[in-house]
Amino acid sequence: MEINVYSASNKLESYVISAVEFAMAKFFDVKDLDKYISVDVDFTDLDVEGHCIDAGDGEFSIEIKKDLPLREKMIVLMHELVHMKQHIAGELEFGGIIIGKDGLKCKTTTWMGAEFDEEGTDYFDRPWEIEAFGRQLGLFIRWVESIDEGHHKKWQV
């Protein structure tokens, strides 16, 4: 698996690489991913905390709001890695994106093989968001424990 990190300090870059490897190992047999997965993680100006884009052919782009505190950046990364897992596993698929007055919107969304109507569903009630929010903190805590900074003050774990 290829991991590229942009707009990050050396320390943050090492955390991101470690966290991506950790989360993907929880989801998949990593040696299978090594063959075809590439992810770019960029810390940038965003109106939202983060998002994950499936660019196709095993290429993913994760952008995270650069102004977040370190702990929040890493939790958002875990959230977006759950979405990356959903795309890789074929659980979540966005069928084209349109740009509207309210920003980016998907033409169609497929969740677990069935078309899903996002229009009438609150963001927090979408099943892929329920999974991502439900797993982000647990992944974060287990990752922190794995890097031997378990209850370090900066992580507030």
Per-range role (PLM):
Residues 81-98:
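Catalytic Zn2+-binding segment of zinc metalloproteases
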Residues 76, 84, 88, 135, ...:
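Short alpha-helical functional segments enriched in proximate histidine and acidic residues
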Residues 1-56, 69-70:
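Auxiliary, metal-adjacent structural segments of Zn-dependent hydrolase domains
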